[in-house]
Amino acid sequence: MTKLALLLIRFYQRFISPGLPPACRFYPTCSEYGYEAISRYGIIKGGVLTVRRLLRCHPFHPGGYDPVP
């Protein structure tokens, strides 16, 4: 399951994201964060960290540097 999630993130990064305007308010980007979190912690904990990050990625949040813990 972890490998599938990582594959889907890479697919998004290579084929979908280049066609969209840059919108992520954070560094690293949300997809990079998700890839690293799932690689490091697995699908459950990494997935929770990724969802929490995605919920913060909106115009009313200042963004900035937010590394994977």
UniProtKB/Swiss-Prot annotation:
Localization of this protein: Cell membrane
Q: What does this protein do?
A: Could be involved in insertion of integral membrane proteins into the membrane.
Which Pfam families is this protein grouped with?
YidD (PF01809)
The lineage's top-level taxon is Bacteria
**Entry keyword annotation includes Membrane:** yes
Keyword Cell membrane part of the UniProt annotation: yes
Q: What is the name listed in the Swiss-Prot or TrEMBL entry for this protein?
A: Putative membrane protein insertion efficiency factor
Q: Which family does it belong to?
A: Belongs to the UPF0161 family.
- UniProt topology in membrane: Peripheral membrane protein
Q: Which UniProt keywords apply?
A: Cell membrane, Membrane
Q: Which PANTHER family match?
A: MEMBRANE PROTEIN INSERTION EFFICIENCY FACTOR-RELATED
A single GO cellular-component term from the record reads: plasma membrane
- What is the originating organism of this protein? Thermomicrobium roseum (strain ATCC 27502 / DSM 5159 / P-2)
